[in-house]
Amino acid sequence: GFFEKAAFYGGTALRIFHGLQRFSEDLDFSLLEVKPGFSLEPYLKGIEKEFSALGVTVSIEEKYKTAATNVDSAFLKPDTAWKELIIKEILPHESVKMRPGLKIKIEIDKTPPLGFTTEERLLLKPFSFYVKCFTLPDLFAGKMHALLFRKWKGRVKGRDWFDMEWYIRKKIPLNLEHLLIRSLDSGDWKEKSMTKEQFMSLFQNKIQLKLFN
């Protein structure tokens, strides 16, 4: 199945499985190994079939991201699969809380920065099944990478600070090794290692920039 090859991560994973009180527009997945030739196509009919069983008609469209429009997804790479699921029609059903025209962006990193660990999390609604997810320390590392290096109109997105505070309040440890790998992968860090002191220096500099901008 799909979760033998990929894991769920990002803000939506944090909301669904860990109770983050913030909505997210994307479904972000990472392959468990680098595989540039991976395709979502074999899974699309299954997605449409599951929605159809709930009385929901959907279409899944291929989307392309160019450098000129690379704003919202600052770390979306050319080898990231990007699909957009569009809710077309819904039959009345008390368990279906969606509206026609709703769009859900699905991203899959086919050449992911590795060094992360995963765990199986149980999803209860609308059906019970297990989902392979990044562990919290690795999710935290991904969020800190976004906060430190995200290039969005020269600013950090407010959601990054909101999420960071959530991790700190929950006393989630940061996987510094995974943060290092992500930073090397994005080209934002050039050294072979990253100490806690170096990380804190980056973090404090980002806070200072936030305070004065």
Segments the model singles out, each with a brief description of its role:
Residues 1-6, 17-20, 32-213:
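Structured mid-to-C-terminal alpha-helical surface segments
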Residues 9-12:
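Glycine-rich beta-strand-to-loop/alpha-helix junction loops that act as flexible
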Residues 24:
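Anion-coordinating catalytic cores for phosphoryl-, nucleotidyl-, and glycosidic chemistry
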